[in-house]
């Protein structure tokens, strides 16, 4: 059988990691079912192993890194790529694995695609201040200028790369698992479980409690909304000092549990103003609930009238008004429209089909063709 072999390589893969792992897992499953396609995934691990096309490459664990590992040696990653001899490599982070892929390209003579999942200059600026921004921007320009094609999950991310001088940038949205996140997972007993009134208006936020999520805005918003509304915060590093109408599940929850909680809520709220895509927004809409998010980052692209409302960033009063307006317009009906919207545009099968078009373009073929093995 004629086979095209695609290899993904990234350090952004850990037990509790977010959008990148979700994307890679969904992609690996679907490419595995495609006739004529082989997919390999290279990720960090405690020791070398291989199972079902997923290769773990030894890398030290990051202290306090919540399962993340940081590769320090380029050689093992490059050597595995040499042994696999893929026809195309996709890079999922801007660190050592990216340079390993580019190094392997020199011997294999295959195209390498870079997927710009994380806004590195903004990330460094948030953590270390603006002094390093010019150097980080120069690094991003140099690294992503080496790829045969660059993918970005949203137009705002693509525009940032283009603004840095990176060429051949294409927007490639991510997707959502329409079976895992489904309205049928709604649990009528959740309000009783949480100890809130049956007629309460239940909001939810799911994700990491990092600075960029602007959780103080949500907490202030809940104080303004009052006891008729209740917010459930789900995820690691959540605040402990919260208003009475807020419940916290301060731990990483598997997708199945998050899906039950989402489908059982009335709406999702999100105050993060630096999102590169916003996968949790799609998960909420797939669960049949609308969203209230801030008009910033990629949310302006994925939150449409079908799925919810946008409000001014960093403004608890504006968010409270948007939540009230959402309920006044009817949450249930808008949640149904949100579900139909993601079914149409964000199913993983649709996303993978779009990815394959990018792969065909850089391989220079209309159909997958054998180049290595």
Predicted regions span which residues?
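Short hydrophobic beta-strand element within catalytic cores of glycosyltransferases
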Residues: 281, 290-293
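Aromatic "clamp/platform" in nucleotide-sugar-dependent glycosyltransferases that forms part
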Residues: 273
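Nucleotide-sugar donor phosphate/pyrophosphate-binding loop at the beta->alpha transition
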Residues: 111, 122-142
């Amino acid at each position: 059988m004629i086979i095209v072999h695609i290899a993904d390589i990234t350090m952004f893969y850990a037990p509790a990691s977010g959008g990148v792992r979700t994307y890679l897992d969904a992609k690996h499953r679907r490419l595995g079912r495609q006739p004529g396609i082989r997919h390999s995934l290279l990720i960090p691990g405690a020791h070398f192993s291989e199972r079902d096309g997923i290769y773990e490459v030894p890398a030290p664990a990051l202290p306090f890194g919540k399962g993340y590992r940081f590769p320090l040696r380029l050689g093992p990653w490059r050597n595995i790529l040499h042994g696999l001899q893929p026809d195309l490599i996709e890079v999922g982070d801007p660190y050592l694995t990216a340079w390993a892929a580019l190094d392997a390209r020199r011997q294999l003579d295959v195209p390498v695609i870079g997927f710009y999942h994380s806004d590195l200059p903004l990330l460094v600026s948030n953590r270390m201040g603006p002094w390093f921004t010019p150097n980080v921007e120069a690094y991003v320009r140099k690294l992503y200028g080496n790829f045969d094609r660059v993918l970005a999950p949203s137009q705002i991310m693509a525009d940032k790369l283009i603004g840095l001088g990176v060429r051949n940038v294409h927007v490639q949205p991510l997707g959502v698992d329409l079976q895992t996140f489904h309205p049928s997972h709604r649990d009528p007993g959740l309000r009783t479980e949480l100890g809130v009134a049956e007629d309460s208006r239940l909001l939810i936020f799911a994700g990491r409690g990092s600075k960029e999520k602007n959780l103080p805005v949500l907490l202030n918003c809940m104080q303004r909304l009052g006891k008729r509304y209740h917010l459930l915060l789900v995820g690691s590093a959540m605040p402990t000092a919260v208003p009475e109408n807020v419940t916290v599940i301060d731990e990483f929850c598997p997708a199945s549990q998050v899906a039950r909680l989402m489908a059982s809520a009335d709406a999702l709220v999100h105050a993060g103003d630096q999102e590169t895509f916003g996968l949790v927004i799609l998960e909420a809409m797939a669960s049949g609930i609308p969203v209230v998010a801030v008009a910033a980052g990629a949310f302006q692209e994925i939150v449409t009238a079908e799925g919810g409302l946008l409000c001014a960033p960093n403004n608890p009063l504006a968010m409270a008004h948007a939540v009230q307006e959402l309920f006044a317009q009817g949450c249930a009906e808008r949640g149904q429209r949100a579900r139909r919207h993601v079914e149409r545009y964000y199913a993983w099968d649709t996303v993978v089909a779009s990815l394959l078009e990018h792969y065909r373009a850089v391989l220079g073929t209309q159909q997958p063709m054998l180049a290595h093995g």
